[in-house]
Amino acid sequence: MITLNNQDQPVPFNNSYPDEYEIAALVFYSCIFIIGLFVNITALWVFSCTTKKRTTVTIYMMNVALVDLIFIMTLPFRMFYYAKDEWPFGEYFCQILGALTVFYPSIALWLLAFISADRYMAIVQPKYAKELKNTCKAVLACVGVWIMTLTTTIPLLLLHKDPDKDSTPATCLKISDIVYLKAVNVLNFTRLTFFFLIPLFIMIGCYLVIIHNLLHGRTSKLKPKVKEKSIRIIITLLVQVLVCFMPFHICFAFLMLGTGENSYSPWGAFTTFLMNLSTCLDVILYYIVSKQFQARVISVMLYRNYLRGMRRKSFRSGSLRSLSNINSEML
Protein backbone atom coordinates (compact mmCIF):
# COMPACT_ATOMS: atom_id res chain seq x y z
CA MET A 1 0.00 0.00 0.00
CA ILE A 2 1.32 3.49 -0.75
CA THR A 3 0.65 7.09 0.14
CA LEU A 4 2.50 10.35 -0.50
CA ASN A 5 5.22 11.92 1.59
CA ASN A 6 6.08 15.60 1.85
CA GLN A 7 7.76 15.57 -1.57
CA ASP A 8 4.70 13.93 -3.16
CA GLN A 9 6.64 10.70 -3.67
CA PRO A 10 4.89 7.40 -3.02
CA VAL A 11 6.01 5.62 0.11
CA PRO A 12 4.69 2.43 1.63
CA PHE A 13 1.89 2.71 4.15
CA ASN A 14 2.05 0.07 6.83
CA ASN A 15 -1.44 -0.64 8.17
CA SER A 16 -0.44 -3.12 10.86
CA TYR A 17 -1.04 -2.13 14.46
CA PRO A 18 0.15 -3.94 17.60
CA ASP A 19 -2.42 -5.97 19.51
CA GLU A 20 -1.54 -3.99 22.63
CA TYR A 21 -2.54 -0.78 20.87
CA GLU A 22 -5.92 -2.16 19.79
CA ILE A 23 -6.68 -3.50 23.29
CA ALA A 24 -5.62 -0.22 24.90
CA ALA A 25 -7.75 1.73 22.40
CA LEU A 26 -10.81 -0.41 23.17
CA VAL A 27 -10.45 0.03 26.93
CA PHE A 28 -9.60 3.72 26.73
CA TYR A 29 -12.37 4.69 24.30
CA SER A 30 -14.93 2.67 26.26
CA CYS A 31 -14.13 4.63 29.42
CA ILE A 32 -14.11 7.94 27.56
CA PHE A 33 -17.45 7.15 25.92
CA ILE A 34 -19.24 6.19 29.17
CA ILE A 35 -17.87 9.05 31.28
CA GLY A 36 -17.90 11.68 28.54
CA LEU A 37 -21.44 10.89 27.40
CA PHE A 38 -22.89 11.27 30.89
CA VAL A 39 -20.85 14.38 31.74
CA ASN A 40 -21.52 16.30 28.54
CA ILE A 41 -25.22 15.41 28.23
CA THR A 42 -25.67 16.60 31.82
CA ALA A 43 -23.70 19.78 31.11
CA LEU A 44 -25.58 20.57 27.90
CA TRP A 45 -28.92 20.04 29.66
CA VAL A 46 -27.89 22.19 32.64
CA PHE A 47 -26.49 25.08 30.58
CA SER A 48 -29.28 25.13 27.98
CA CYS A 49 -32.38 24.22 30.01
CA THR A 50 -31.91 24.90 33.72
CA THR A 51 -29.65 27.98 33.76
CA LYS A 52 -31.89 31.04 34.09
CA LYS A 53 -29.28 33.80 33.87
CA ARG A 54 -27.02 33.04 30.93
CA THR A 55 -23.65 34.73 30.63
CA THR A 56 -20.93 34.61 28.01
CA VAL A 57 -19.23 31.74 29.87
CA THR A 58 -22.50 29.79 29.80
CA ILE A 59 -22.66 30.16 26.00
CA TYR A 60 -19.06 29.00 25.63
CA MET A 61 -19.69 26.02 27.91
CA MET A 62 -22.75 24.99 25.89
CA ASN A 63 -20.58 24.93 22.78
CA VAL A 64 -17.82 22.99 24.55
CA ALA A 65 -20.34 20.36 25.66
CA LEU A 66 -21.85 20.17 22.15
CA VAL A 67 -18.45 19.72 20.48
CA ASP A 68 -17.50 17.07 23.04
CA LEU A 69 -20.74 15.17 22.38
CA ILE A 70 -20.26 15.23 18.60
CA PHE A 71 -16.79 13.77 19.01
CA ILE A 72 -17.86 11.25 21.66
CA MET A 73 -20.62 9.87 19.42
CA THR A 74 -17.96 8.72 16.94
CA LEU A 75 -16.19 6.55 19.52
CA PRO A 76 -18.44 3.45 19.16
CA PHE A 77 -17.41 3.23 15.49
CA ARG A 78 -13.75 3.43 16.48
CA MET A 79 -14.25 0.73 19.11
CA PHE A 80 -15.98 -1.53 16.56
CA TYR A 81 -13.05 -1.06 14.17
CA TYR A 82 -10.46 -1.99 16.79
CA ALA A 83 -12.52 -4.98 17.97
CA LYS A 84 -13.23 -6.44 14.51
CA ASP A 85 -10.17 -5.25 12.54
CA GLU A 86 -12.40 -4.25 9.64
CA TRP A 87 -14.38 -1.20 8.54
CA PRO A 88 -17.88 -1.94 7.14
CA PHE A 89 -19.14 1.67 7.20
CA GLY A 90 -17.66 2.86 3.91
CA GLU A 91 -14.78 5.12 2.91
CA TYR A 92 -16.71 8.40 3.07
CA PHE A 93 -17.74 7.87 6.69
CA CYS A 94 -14.13 6.96 7.45
CA GLN A 95 -13.09 10.32 5.97
CA ILE A 96 -15.64 12.12 8.15
CA LEU A 97 -14.31 10.49 11.32
CA GLY A 98 -10.75 11.32 10.29
CA ALA A 99 -11.72 14.94 9.68
CA LEU A 100 -13.35 15.11 13.13
CA THR A 101 -9.98 14.15 14.64
CA VAL A 102 -8.74 17.52 13.36
CA PHE A 103 -12.01 19.43 13.80
CA TYR A 104 -12.39 18.71 17.52
CA PRO A 105 -9.10 20.16 18.87
CA SER A 106 -9.32 23.10 16.46
CA ILE A 107 -12.68 24.37 17.69
CA ALA A 108 -12.10 23.30 21.31
CA LEU A 109 -8.95 25.42 21.60
CA TRP A 110 -10.73 28.53 20.32
CA LEU A 111 -13.56 28.01 22.80
CA LEU A 112 -11.02 27.70 25.62
CA ALA A 113 -9.37 30.90 24.35
CA PHE A 114 -12.75 32.68 24.53
CA ILE A 115 -13.20 31.51 28.12
CA SER A 116 -9.70 32.78 28.96
CA ALA A 117 -10.50 36.18 27.44
CA ASP A 118 -13.74 36.22 29.41
CA ARG A 119 -11.84 35.67 32.67
CA TYR A 120 -9.41 38.43 31.65
CA MET A 121 -12.35 40.81 31.35
CA ALA A 122 -13.74 39.69 34.71
CA ILE A 123 -10.46 40.15 36.63
CA VAL A 124 -8.44 42.83 34.81
CA GLN A 125 -11.26 44.93 33.35
CA PRO A 126 -14.09 44.73 35.91
CA LYS A 127 -15.48 48.08 34.68
CA TYR A 128 -16.59 46.21 31.55
CA ALA A 129 -18.39 43.56 33.59
CA LYS A 130 -21.63 44.28 31.74
CA GLU A 131 -20.04 42.85 28.61
CA LEU A 132 -19.86 39.47 30.34
CA LYS A 133 -23.66 39.38 30.23
CA ASN A 134 -23.80 40.25 26.52
CA THR A 135 -24.59 36.78 25.23
CA CYS A 136 -25.21 38.01 21.67
CA LYS A 137 -21.50 38.71 21.13
CA ALA A 138 -20.61 35.32 22.59
CA VAL A 139 -23.06 33.59 20.24
CA LEU A 140 -21.62 35.46 17.23
CA ALA A 141 -18.07 34.52 18.28
CA CYS A 142 -19.03 30.85 18.58
CA VAL A 143 -20.85 30.85 15.23
CA GLY A 144 -17.79 32.44 13.61
CA VAL A 145 -15.46 29.78 15.02
CA TRP A 146 -17.80 26.97 13.92
CA ILE A 147 -17.88 28.36 10.37
CA MET A 148 -14.10 28.86 10.19
CA THR A 149 -13.33 25.42 11.59
CA LEU A 150 -15.79 23.68 9.26
CA THR A 151 -14.40 25.62 6.28
CA THR A 152 -10.84 24.44 6.95
CA THR A 153 -11.88 20.88 7.84
CA ILE A 154 -14.07 20.13 4.81
CA PRO A 155 -11.03 19.97 2.45
CA LEU A 156 -9.92 16.86 4.38
CA LEU A 157 -12.96 15.09 2.93
CA LEU A 158 -11.83 15.99 -0.58
CA LEU A 159 -8.05 15.69 -0.43
CA HIS A 160 -7.44 12.43 1.41
CA LYS A 161 -8.22 8.98 0.10
CA ASP A 162 -7.67 5.89 2.18
CA PRO A 163 -4.53 4.22 0.75
CA ASP A 164 -5.91 0.86 1.84
CA LYS A 165 -9.52 1.26 0.65
CA ASP A 166 -9.39 -1.74 -1.70
CA SER A 167 -8.00 -4.15 0.88
CA THR A 168 -9.88 -7.12 2.28
CA PRO A 169 -11.19 -6.69 4.91
CA ALA A 170 -11.77 -2.96 4.49
CA THR A 171 -9.82 -0.65 6.82
CA CYS A 172 -10.05 2.92 8.08
CA LEU A 173 -6.53 4.10 8.75
CA LYS A 174 -7.59 7.70 9.32
CA ILE A 175 -9.05 7.12 12.78
CA SER A 176 -6.05 5.28 14.26
CA ASP A 177 -3.81 8.27 14.87
CA ILE A 178 -2.69 11.45 13.10
CA VAL A 179 0.00 9.90 10.91
CA TYR A 180 -2.16 10.05 7.76
CA LEU A 181 -2.43 13.86 7.96
CA LYS A 182 1.02 14.45 6.48
CA ALA A 183 0.01 14.72 2.85
CA VAL A 184 -0.93 18.43 2.48
CA ASN A 185 1.51 20.47 4.53
CA VAL A 186 0.44 23.94 3.34
CA LEU A 187 -3.07 23.44 4.67
CA ASN A 188 -1.77 21.70 7.78
CA PHE A 189 0.67 24.48 8.71
CA THR A 190 -2.09 27.05 8.20
CA ARG A 191 -4.38 25.04 10.45
CA LEU A 192 -1.61 24.57 13.03
CA THR A 193 -0.99 28.32 13.14
CA PHE A 194 -4.57 29.56 13.21
CA PHE A 195 -6.19 26.83 15.30
CA PHE A 196 -3.38 26.13 17.76
CA LEU A 197 -0.73 28.84 18.00
CA ILE A 198 -3.06 31.87 17.89
CA PRO A 199 -5.53 30.61 20.55
CA LEU A 200 -2.56 29.38 22.61
CA PHE A 201 -0.95 32.84 22.53
CA ILE A 202 -4.30 34.44 23.44
CA MET A 203 -4.57 32.17 26.48
CA ILE A 204 -0.95 32.74 27.53
CA GLY A 205 -1.34 36.52 27.14
CA CYS A 206 -4.51 36.55 29.23
CA TYR A 207 -2.93 34.40 31.94
CA LEU A 208 0.22 36.55 32.17
CA VAL A 209 -1.76 39.78 32.49
CA ILE A 210 -4.09 38.21 35.06
CA ILE A 211 -1.18 36.87 37.15
CA HIS A 212 0.59 40.25 36.94
CA ASN A 213 -2.52 42.05 38.20
CA LEU A 214 -3.06 39.53 40.99
CA LEU A 215 0.55 39.78 42.18
CA HIS A 216 0.52 43.60 42.20
CA GLY A 217 -2.80 43.87 44.00
CA ARG A 218 -4.69 45.57 41.19
CA THR A 219 -7.76 43.40 41.68
CA SER A 220 -8.70 44.62 45.17
CA LYS A 221 -12.15 45.76 44.00
CA LEU A 222 -12.96 42.25 42.86
CA LYS A 223 -15.08 40.01 45.04
CA PRO A 224 -13.02 37.15 46.56
CA LYS A 225 -15.44 34.53 45.19
CA VAL A 226 -15.14 35.90 41.64
CA LYS A 227 -11.35 36.02 41.92
CA GLU A 228 -11.14 32.47 43.30
CA LYS A 229 -13.50 31.11 40.64
CA SER A 230 -11.54 32.79 37.84
CA ILE A 231 -8.22 31.44 39.13
CA ARG A 232 -9.64 27.91 39.24
CA ILE A 233 -10.91 28.23 35.68
CA ILE A 234 -7.51 29.50 34.48
CA ILE A 235 -5.61 26.66 36.17
CA THR A 236 -8.04 24.10 34.73
CA LEU A 237 -7.71 25.52 31.21
CA LEU A 238 -3.92 25.63 31.45
CA VAL A 239 -3.65 22.01 32.60
CA GLN A 240 -6.08 20.87 29.91
CA VAL A 241 -4.15 22.61 27.13
CA LEU A 242 -0.75 21.36 28.34
CA VAL A 243 -1.88 17.76 28.89
CA CYS A 244 -4.40 17.17 26.10
CA PHE A 245 -3.73 19.54 23.21
CA MET A 246 -0.08 20.58 23.21
CA PRO A 247 1.40 17.04 22.83
CA PHE A 248 -1.07 16.32 20.00
CA HIS A 249 -0.06 19.43 18.03
CA ILE A 250 3.67 19.02 18.70
CA CYS A 251 3.45 15.47 17.34
CA PHE A 252 1.39 16.79 14.44
CA ALA A 253 4.16 19.29 13.59
CA PHE A 254 6.93 16.66 13.78
CA LEU A 255 4.96 14.30 11.54
CA MET A 256 4.58 17.02 8.94
CA LEU A 257 8.30 17.82 9.04
CA GLY A 258 9.34 14.17 8.90
CA THR A 259 9.85 12.02 5.84
CA GLY A 260 9.90 8.33 5.17
CA GLU A 261 7.47 5.51 5.84
CA ASN A 262 4.01 6.33 7.12
CA SER A 263 3.35 3.63 9.68
CA TYR A 264 2.04 3.15 13.17
CA SER A 265 3.40 5.86 15.44
CA PRO A 266 3.27 5.13 19.20
CA TRP A 267 3.75 8.84 19.93
CA GLY A 268 0.99 9.77 17.48
CA ALA A 269 -1.37 7.20 18.98
CA PHE A 270 -0.60 8.28 22.56
CA THR A 271 -1.10 11.99 21.85
CA THR A 272 -4.38 11.18 20.10
CA PHE A 273 -5.48 9.38 23.28
CA LEU A 274 -4.57 12.47 25.32
CA MET A 275 -6.55 14.70 22.98
CA ASN A 276 -9.60 12.45 23.43
CA LEU A 277 -9.19 12.70 27.20
CA SER A 278 -10.17 16.37 27.01
CA THR A 279 -13.83 15.38 26.50
CA CYS A 280 -13.84 14.07 30.09
CA LEU A 281 -11.62 16.70 31.71
CA ASP A 282 -14.15 19.37 30.74
CA VAL A 283 -16.19 18.14 33.71
CA ILE A 284 -13.85 20.17 35.95
CA LEU A 285 -14.75 23.34 34.05
CA TYR A 286 -18.46 22.56 34.21
CA TYR A 287 -18.23 21.92 37.94
CA ILE A 288 -16.39 25.19 38.63
CA VAL A 289 -18.59 27.39 36.44
CA SER A 290 -22.10 26.14 37.20
CA LYS A 291 -23.74 25.66 40.59
CA GLN A 292 -26.58 23.85 38.80
CA PHE A 293 -24.09 21.35 37.37
CA GLN A 294 -22.59 20.87 40.83
CA ALA A 295 -26.04 20.20 42.25
CA ARG A 296 -26.88 17.74 39.46
CA VAL A 297 -23.63 15.78 39.92
CA ILE A 298 -24.08 15.72 43.70
CA SER A 299 -27.69 14.54 43.36
CA VAL A 300 -26.61 11.69 41.08
CA MET A 301 -23.86 10.68 43.52
CA LEU A 302 -26.29 10.82 46.46
CA TYR A 303 -28.82 8.75 44.52
CA ARG A 304 -26.18 6.12 43.75
CA ASN A 305 -25.20 6.05 47.43
CA TYR A 306 -28.89 5.69 48.32
CA LEU A 307 -29.28 2.73 45.95
CA ARG A 308 -26.10 1.16 47.31
CA GLY A 309 -27.40 1.54 50.86
CA MET A 310 -30.75 0.01 49.92
CA ARG A 311 -28.99 -2.98 48.36
CA ARG A 312 -26.94 -3.48 51.52
CA LYS A 313 -30.07 -3.28 53.70
CA SER A 314 -31.94 -5.77 51.51
CA PHE A 315 -28.92 -8.10 51.54
CA ARG A 316 -28.66 -7.90 55.35
CA SER A 317 -32.40 -8.44 55.85
CA GLY A 318 -32.29 -11.39 53.44
CA SER A 319 -29.34 -12.87 55.32
CA LEU A 320 -31.14 -12.44 58.66
CA ARG A 321 -34.27 -14.11 57.31
CA SER A 322 -32.22 -17.04 56.02
CA LEU A 323 -30.46 -17.36 59.38
CA SER A 324 -33.76 -17.30 61.29
CA ASN A 325 -35.19 -19.97 58.99
CA ILE A 326 -32.17 -22.20 59.63
CA ASN A 327 -32.50 -21.72 63.40
CA SER A 328 -36.22 -22.53 63.34
CA GLU A 329 -35.55 -25.71 61.35
CA MET A 330 -32.88 -26.76 63.85
CA LEU A 331 -35.30 -26.19 66.72
Curated annotation (Swiss-Prot):
Glycans are attached at N14, N188. The chain crosses the membrane at residues 27-47, 57-77, 96-116, 139-159, 192-212, 233-253, 269-289. It is a multi-pass membrane protein. Disulfide bonds join C94-C172. It is found in: Cell membrane; Cytoplasmic vesicle membrane. InterPro entries: GPCR_Rhodpsn, GPCR_Rhodpsn_7TM, GPR18. GO terms for biological process: phospholipase C-activating G protein-coupled receptor signaling pathway; positive regulation of Rho protein signal transduction. GO terms for molecular function: G protein-coupled receptor activity. Residues 48-56, 117-138, 213-232, 290-331 are cytoplasmic. Residues 1-26, 78-95, 160-191, 254-268 are extracellular. Keywords: Cell membrane, Cytoplasmic vesicle, Disulfide bond, G-protein coupled receptor, Glycoprotein, Membrane, Phosphoprotein, Receptor, Transducer, Transmembrane, Transmembrane helix. The keyword Cell membrane applies. Gene3D superfamilies: Rhodopsin 7-helix transmembrane proteins. The modification Phosphoserine is found at S322. Belongs to the G-protein coupled receptor 1 family. G protein-coupled receptor (GPCR) that plays a role in diverse physiological processes particularly within the immune and nervous systems. Becomes active when triggered by various endogenous ligands including endocannabinoid N-arachidonyl glycine (NAGly), delta-9-tetrahydrocannabinol or resolvin D2/RvD2 derived from the omega-3 fatty acid docosahexaenoic acid (DHA). Upon RvD2 binding, facilitates the resolution of inflammation, aiding in tissue repair and homeostasis. This is N-arachidonyl glycine receptor. It comes from Macaca fascicularis. The gene is GPR18.
